[in-house]
Amino acid sequence: MNRGIEEIVGSTTEQLIEVGPLKWFYREVQPTQQTDKSPIVFLHGIPSQSLTWREMMPQVAEWGWRAIAPDWIGHGFSSKPERFQFAYTPDAYRTALEGFLAALEIEQFSLVVQGFLGTVGLQFALAHRDRIERLVILNAPLSPTAKLPWKMKQWGIPLAGEMLTQDPLLVDRTLEGGSGFRIPDEYLDIYRKPFLQTSEAGRALLATTRNLNLAKAMAEIEAGFADWTQPTAIFWGGADPWLDGEAAKKLASSRPNIDFYPFPEAKHYPQEHWSEEIGKDLVEFLRRQN
């Protein structure tokens, strides 16, 4: 294991840590005062990266939580191994996440997940529920009816997907199309950068998309939530063009430990444009007594 700080941006540190053959990039915000609160781990969806949590992480740190947001392997600025080195399956991602958490000596924590790759975070939480203090979900698939939208599904098509995933503007079209609002160029430049630096970024996105196995993941998640007891909050962008919020509402209404926070105008990536509003509710949820 090898760990080093690359750069400090405001109160957010950008770091790299080597876990076996994998190199994880992650952002971290330390609380202004030391507390005994367990950390919060933020997991992004596709084709995003940890930058998507740039505003929410300082919000929770201000209230005493250490916030950590990694770039998934194959995404953002983490390593992008070839498929014979890393399978890009949910199981491979869960194993890799376990290694990342162990390297940072994180045992008990709260988990925040978003988007289609967020399903891996949900699968991890359901398999390690004794380690999860609180779970927070933002616009992630939650029922067997959830499907990968065509905009993403086409990334996994032979030949066509190989061309599409090499286009850096794919990031602009997906993040802005999914969120419904313009994302400032200063952030789009960072989101695009991995695709401009190496063709490995596109190949990793293609492999991730092909191997999501959403149907199997949804079956596991639906079964797992049947007896889920940890405090949970669902923050939902009601205008999501790709996911139906009814499944999220139904899940929340079926469990007394799950709260539902609607944001009617927000879409698939609500944290991009509603981070202040979501952050306030998130802090209130985290501070609430069980």
Sequence positions of predicted segments:
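N-terminal cap/lid segment of alpha/beta-hydrolase-fold proteins
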Residues: G4-K23
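Active-site loop/oxyanion-hole signature of alpha/beta-hydrolase fold enzymes
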Residues: G20, R27-Q30, E62, A69-V113, ...
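Conserved HGGG/HGGXW glycine-rich cap/lid loop of the alpha/beta-hydrolase fold
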Residues: V29-F77
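Glycine-rich nucleophile elbow surrounding the catalytic serine of serine-hydrolase chemistry
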Residues: Q114-Q123
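Flexible "cap/lid" loop of the alpha/beta hydrolase fold
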Residues: L126, E133-M163
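Conserved serine/cysteine hydrolase catalytic core
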Residues: A201-S253, P262
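Catalytic active-site module of serine/aspartate enzymes centered on a nucleophile-bearing elbow/loop
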Residues: I258-N290
